[in-house]
Amino acid sequence: MAYDVCVYGGNASGVMAACAAAKEGAKVIVVEPSRWLGGMTGGGLMHIDWGREEAVSGSTRPILKQDFNDAQYRKVFAEMLKSAGVTVLFEHRVSAVLKVDGLIRTVDLDFAPFDEYGCPPAKPTKAMARVIKAKVFIDCSYEGDLMARAGVAYAYGREAKSTYDESLAGAQPPMSVYAIDPYVKAGDPQSGLLPGLQSTPVAPVGEADKLTMGYGFRWRFVFKGESLPIEPPANYDP
C-alpha cells in the first residue's frame, strides 16, 4: 500500500493533519490503533480541557465551537476524512520501521483489535499484517510509538528547573495529600502495594525524574434517554 502521506494516529490532531495534506493533493492514509477516530476528543474529553478559546485556531476552532458530544465528534471526524478522500485503517499498530538514508520508507503494522472495553491487547491477532509505504510519515499518536520505532531521540519524565531555566519545571510538591492506605492489607507494608501504585520516590522540588503523568478515567453521565443506574458494589464502604 503506497501513499504520499501516512498519518499514524487518528486522534483530532491526526485527522486535521490528514485533511491538510489531502487539501494539498496528497494521497493520504490514517492508521489508527483503536476502532474509533478522535482520540480523547472522540472519547468525551472536549471543552473541559480546552483552556483559553483564543489558543485554538485554524480548522480546529470551528469544530470545537460546535460543542458536540463524543459520538458526534467521531462522526464529524469520519465525515471530514471521507470528504477529503483519506483512507482510514483501524485496529493496526506499528511494529517495525524501515529507514533508508535516515528517512522512513515503510512501516510494518500488526493487526491488534482492542477488546470490548477499549483496551489494547498485549499481543497482536496477526503480526506483520500490513506494510505501508509513504513519502512522508507523520506521528500523531499520543505515545509517539512511530517516532520511537524510527529511532528518533526523545525524553520522558520531568526536566529539571535548571535544564532550560524554567521556574516551574521539575518535580513539584503535591497539591493535596489524602489519608488513603496504599497497602493490600491496611497498615502492612509487607502485604505489598495496591494494583497500579508504585514505590518510586518523587524527586526533590525542581529536580528531574522519570515519572510520567498518571492515567485518569472519566465517565460521561447523561440524565435521560440512555441513562443507566449507578449501583454501588457489594463491598462498598462509604
For each predicted feature, which ranges?
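Beta1/beta-strand and adjacent pyrophosphate-binding region of the FAD-binding site
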Residues: M1-S13
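Structural recognition of the beta-strand scaffold that forms the well-ordered cores
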Residues: C6-Y8, I29-E32, G39-T41, H47, ...
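Short, surface-exposed loop/turn motifs at beta-strand boundaries within globular domains
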Residues: G10, K23-E24, K210-T212
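Alpha-helix N-cap/helix-initiation motif
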Residues: G10-N11, Q66, A127-R130
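Solvent-exposed loop/turn segments at secondary-structure junctions
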Residues: N11-S13, R35-L37, H47-I48, S95-A96, ...
